[in-house]
Amino acid sequence: MTFAFSKKIELKPILKFDTPKVYSYEIIQEIEALVQRLFLQVWRRPATLMAGIIQPLLWLVLFGGLFCNAPVNLFTINTSYNRFLSSGIIVFTSFTGALNSGLPLMFDREFGFLNRLLTAPLISRTSIIFSSATFMTCLSLIQVIFIVIASLFMGNSPLSSNSTLIFALIVLLVTVGVTMLSLALSFTLPGHIELLALILVVNLPFLFSSTALAPLYFMPPWLQLIASLNPLSYAIEGIRYIYSNTDWNFTESVIKISWGDISLGQIISLLLFLDVIGAYIVSNILKARLN
């Protein structure tokens, strides 16, 4: 016996699965809440913020006072040493603040709060990283603003609006790049003692091996080579160029090194390139640690 079906039977799924969406608003809310927590910690314990302002201010006042009677043309043409030093201290302030950005995350690891965040129903775990980076960038910029105001009393003239934008861009590129490196170290190193030891070892050598305290031609050849490889030297010379030239441009030579002249546009491109490379490397490290 045979059976014939007049209609063709089609199987259709009852459940429909939507493709995953990016909840940008919820991620922004997560970052905002975590940033507020970090700022609340600073409000309750402002010693970190005060130390980040007082230390570079002491460098600016004491080290600048040490060479205040030096001839005006000794370091650069028609520039006093206080004006010469202020650009280096501004970049050094942003560098030091960003270098310490991994400490709050390291303490969260040690006290177990990071584990609570990782087990919380977050939309994205990257909000933990973005909140720490945003917080330390804002904190470093606050410290830089205080040093800029202090440098006005040391002989620096106020910047124009265009110069202020380029100034802020250079400081931001330095801060973001070093912040990403410090956050990666906070996941890589075993504890805060190792991170503090690394910060103490790295901090001053980066300062002395840059053009913050003296120009390149004051240094021996071996130190000139190290300073030419130090990214802080390019950021310092870029800010120094903006302060000393009201009619600056992106193509004029800013710093002369052994392998050529570097312009302001090339300095910004170099810092941006280093940030992109650093972000790629750090993102791979953080993905491996967070997952």
Curated annotation (Swiss-Prot):
Disulfide bonding pattern of the chain: none
GO MF, one annotated term: ABC-type transporter activity
Keywords linked to the UniProt accession: Chloroplast, Membrane, Plastid, Transmembrane, Transmembrane helix, Transport
PROSITE patterns linked to this entry: ABC_TM2
Domain of life the protein comes from: Eukaryota
The keyword Membrane belongs to this UniProt entry's keyword annotation: yes
TM regions (residue ranges): 47-67, 87-107, 135-155, 165-185, 195-215, 262-282
Domain ABC transmembrane type-2 residues, every copy: 47-289
Pfam families: ABC2_membrane
CC annotations in GO: ATP-binding cassette (ABC) transporter complex; chloroplast membrane
Family stated for the protein in its record: Belongs to the ABC-2 integral membrane protein family.
InterPro entries (alphabetical): ABC2_TM (IPR013525), ABC2_TM_bact-type (IPR047817), ABC_2_transport (IPR000412), T7SS_ABC-Transporter (IPR051328)
Principal location class: plastid
Membrane topology, from the record: Multi-pass membrane protein
Keyword Glycosyltransferase found: no
Places the protein is found: Plastid, Chloroplast membrane
Name of protein: Putative transport permease ycf38
